[in-house]
Amino acid sequence: MQIVDKSFQNFDKFLEISNEEGAFALINKPKTWTSFNVVNKLRYATKVKKVGHAGTLDPLAEGLVLVAFGKKATKEINNLILLKKRYLAQFKLGATTKSYDSEFEEENIKDTSAVNLKIIQELIANNFIGEISQMPPDFS
């Protein structure tokens, strides 16, 4: 099985590898697309029958989706999902929305001028380290 990087220029060779050995590619999912949209578009564009992804990103999130091409690669997806992941997030302080994301208009707007990096780091260290159980919002 092969992992190709952005320097890999031979698309026909990629398709050959996908069908014979299986291959993985990191795809930058745009905002509003679902991970399933990415898979469907790639399946259609490449004509590879077996295409799958190793984890769902929220439609409002932008980010990398690991996409498996070919039967051998898609069989490995369940093993990959169990691996540890790291996330990088951007957030805005001082407002809420009905959906807890950018889908609805901001409300309850507060002044955040007194907030600094030290305060944020302390809040994270005291509240968001280790295993966390959360209740999903009504809009999810």
Locate the predicted segments by residue:
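Catalytic/RNA-binding core of pseudouridine synthases
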Residues: 1-140
